[in-house]
Amino acid sequence: MTASGGGSTAATGRMPTWKERENNKKRERRRRAIAAKIFTGLRSQGNYKLPKHCDNNEVLKALCLEAGWIVHEDGTTYRKGSRPTETTVPCSSIQLSPQSSAFQSPIPSYQASPSSSSYPSPTRFDPNQSSTYLIPYLQNLASSGNLAPLRISNSAPVTPPISSPRRSNPRLPRWQSSNFPVSAPSSPTRRLHHYTSIPECDESDVSTVDSCRWGNFQSVNVSQTCPPSPTFNLVGKSVSSVGVDVSVKPWEGEKIHDVGIDDLELTLGHNTKGRG
């Protein structure tokens, strides 16, 4: 009790009073007197072999030995013939952590790659198989039935093999497409034609009235015009399409003559001379 009182004093940070020290001495003397009487009664009437200066642990050890228990020096106590496998104290608050293999690890969210799990191992050799292959497992690779199905997960997408096609139907060439016009010419010669532009007058300040160009509406060069239809090259050429200048025939009651570009007037369908 003196040691305990000193420990509590150091913990509280104050010195016990004289009255408290006297009370602690009285309790300690009473405890020792009661223990001495118990030890004397056990020695005389119980035939216990207890040392002269013993404590409560010696008494407990003697009681266990009388009851047929085994008590070691470190305090391990058990019945005869039933040695415990674990040295855990039932009243202890210490809990042993379970081993790492006590609980099964959860299944991972990803799946194994087919490149590593589908191909059989070289050790899987069947003696009944043909020996024509240099390596035994090459025969397993040759048959497509041994390949495991591809397992795909949402969390880990699997890249398809390089040899797999990118789409189910191959793309047809452009010339085999149904939208390609059949009536288009098979020869690209129509791109070589240079279309004739409308003759324009020189509107610069240096030009005069007489320097304007004159348009001839009687002769037209057929070879310089664009083809009349997409099937122009598919039809046999006539005499008029060889490149010969052909004169335009007037209708009945119509007169064709050369007209200057400046003499033409845009009337938008109305005759201005008739109004005047």
From Swiss-Prot:
UniProt cross-references to InterPro entries, sorted A to Z: BES1_N, BZR
Entry similarity comment = Belongs to the BZR/LAT61 family.
Give the region (Disordered) as residue ranges. 1-30, 76-125, 155-191
Q: Does the record's keyword annotation contain Aminoacyl-tRNA synthetase? A: no
List, alphabetically, the GO terms of the cellular component aspect. Answer: plant-type vacuole
Processing and modification events after translation? Phosphorylated. Phosphorylation increases protein degradation.
Region (Required for DNA-binding) residue ranges read: 14-87
One Pfam assignment: BES1_N
The organism's lineage is:
Eukaryota, Viridiplantae, Streptophyta, Embryophyta, Tracheophyta
Q: Which domain of life is it from?
A: Eukaryota
Is Transferase found in the keyword set?
no
Phosphothreonine modification sites?
T159
User: One GO molecular function term?
Assistant: DNA binding
Q: What is this protein called?
A: BES1/BZR1 homolog protein 1
Renumbered to this chain, the Polar residues biased-composition regions fall at 84-103, 175-189
